[in-house]
Amino acid sequence: MQRIDRTRFDVIVVGGGHAGVEAAAAAARLGAATALVTHRRATLGAMSCNPAIGGLGKGHLVREVDALDGLMGRVADRAGIQFRLLNRRKGPAVRGPRSQADRKLYARAMQEALAATPNLSLIEGEAHDLAVVEGRVTGIVLADGRALPCAAVVLTTGTFLRGLIHIGERTMPAGRVGEAPALGLAATLDRHGFGLGRLKTGTPARLDGRTIDWAGIEKQAADDEPVPFSSLTDRITTPQIECGVTRTTQAVHDLIRANLHRSPMYSGGITSRGPRYCPSIEDKVVRFGDRDGHQIFLEPEGLDDPTIYPNGISTALPEEVQRAVLRLIPGCERAAMLRPGYAIEYDYVDPRELDPTLQTRRVAGLFLAGQINGTTGYEEAAGQGILAGINAARLAAGSALAVLDRAESYIGVMIDDLVTHGVSEPYRMFTSRSEYRLSLRVDNADERLTGRGIALGCVGAARARHFAESQQALAAARARLDALAITPSEAARHGLALNRDGIRRSAFQLLSYPEIDWPRLAAIWPELAAVPPRVAERLRTDAAYAVYLDRQRSDIAAFRRDEAVRLPASLDYGRIAGLSNELRLKLDCVRPHTLGQAARIEGVTPAALTLLAAHARRADAAAPAEA
């Protein structure tokens, strides 16, 4: 990555957060001359809130970004200082890899990855305006007046669009602490008629770990065998650390209740919605009044950084109240507050303004990714960013744009949810959002998406080679399992109790039994001991879910049939007899691309779908004549 080496680009990405870096790197991997515009080079890849990657649902997104040769997984593996596999006791489909990260190491590793990316230039500056001619973006204008022409723009503005920080009664315009908001771009989007709304998020105070009484605090260790995010990572080499666990007390809750009138969420200073699944401590105290305490994870921000992130007490109370609250938390009675917590409000664009490609419908060549689309979280941003970057590069090259659907990825689930339903609060990924989650597991992200990425041009040679080798190893091991078989009598001699029905069962079928693991199989067939652990674990999961996956494949086939029925972009819903006015308004707002997407709009009835299918068939029949 160079500072700037040209005056015209194929793709310009605005914003260097988690969506922006993935968008820029993806576009560059496709061969597009790409510029990444950010206020300061030093903030590229910054973790603005919690120093962690992954988690339930989110870990799936990281694996999918990695499968498309994105950066987040590899960078998180380099910077991770506490790896834990969440939901380990539950089924493989809902387990979530998570890593506490060294904040400085993560940013440095991300910047190094970008620097090693060909076709990518860095421009330090503020994007102030879009150049739009006849409904198509032709470039951007920087705050210093420089015009940068291009074929496609990706906006990844995070919380910067008219960002406003709240700490008690005090407010300050900012995109995050110490950085100015993006006012010009917000005005530009207004001018072009985009539907803008306001959302809010928050962050807790930062503490000095040297002033915390760790002796009386419960410790949470990293996993003994860290599970990496990237399929290209053989093992984790970064030292692993412990986190602390403490709780709020009744005295904390009483103090917060006594000062609710000073919190902007309760004084009327903030009226926008925040993330439901990451509430402030004020919201926790109000919504869960019967609880005598709320868990707080004391998470170190780095191996050589004393800063502690107290996960669980995001707040916008006045600074002096925050200090008083700390005095009442076990272990934090003498903790020094390095920076107060705050809430931040920002503009977002109604994601129903987007196509599933993440291109806006109002301005051709303009793509949006990340919090500007109403999502929350680094991983959600990265998932959108990589698809937006791919499609921006493909548009610049004159190629067809790509869509990831619900049946192949959590990225597809997220984008379909956004463009179909919009948001009323910041959108967070959970495995429960997918109806195909047995098929969309963290262990098969490569199989689902890397081949697709190779076809799209976003996967480099090293990953393509690794993918081919791993698929060959998987296929060979599966073929061996299918070829090996045993009768119930033979199994009994090995200590396995099977139904005495005389039926020979393959090793793959045996692997579906909960009590039969890979070592038990290897005791019967010693050659299986040579199968790599990753391959063995993957095959055991496939075997355990085999019956259910067969059913799900049938469901996915039905889904794909509905997705194959395209609805004309010019379809006038107001002229379709039999649709209620309410449905006409909803359909006109979303403008579904397929019959399947229309079916997912709230209130759309089977009768309405029949009418839409009839219009789609008529449009298909008329297409050859029009051509």
Curated annotation (Swiss-Prot):
Cited SMART domains: GIDA_assoc_3
InterPro entries, A to Z: FAD/NAD-bd_sf (IPR036188), GIDA_C_N (IPR049312), MnmG (IPR004416), MnmG-rel (IPR002218), MnmG-rel_CS (IPR020595), MnmG_C (IPR026904), MnmG_C_subdom (IPR047001), MnmG_C_subdom_sf (IPR044920)
Gene Ontology biological process: tRNA methylation; tRNA wobble uridine modification
Domain of life: Bacteria
Entry-linked Gene3D superfamilies: FAD/NAD(P)-binding domain, GidA associated domain, C-terminal subdomain, tRNA uridine 5-carboxymethylaminomethyl modification enzyme MnmG/GidA
One MF annotation (Gene Ontology) recorded for this entry: flavin adenine dinucleotide binding
Residues noted as binding FAD in the record, renumbered to the chain: 15-20
Key word Protein transport present: no
Pfam families hit by this protein: GIDA, GIDA_C_1st, SAM_GIDA_C
Record localization: Cytoplasm
Binding site for NAD(+): 274-288
UniProt keyword list: Cytoplasm, FAD, Flavoprotein, NAD, tRNA processing
Cofactors that this protein relies on: FAD
Cellular component GO terms held in the UniProt record: cytosol
HAMAP family: MnmG_GidA
Protein task: NAD-binding protein involved in the addition of a carboxymethylaminomethyl (cmnm) group at the wobble position (U34) of certain tRNAs, forming tRNA-cmnm(5)s(2)U34.
Assembly and oligomerization: Homodimer. Heterotetramer of two MnmE and two MnmG subunits.
UniProt family annotation: Belongs to the MnmG family.
Database matches in NCBIfam families: mnmG_gidA
Protein name: tRNA uridine 5-carboxymethylaminomethyl modification enzyme MnmG
Organism: Methylobacterium sp. (strain 4-46)
Lineage, broadest ranks: Bacteria, Pseudomonadati, Pseudomonadota, Alphaproteobacteria, Hyphomicrobiales
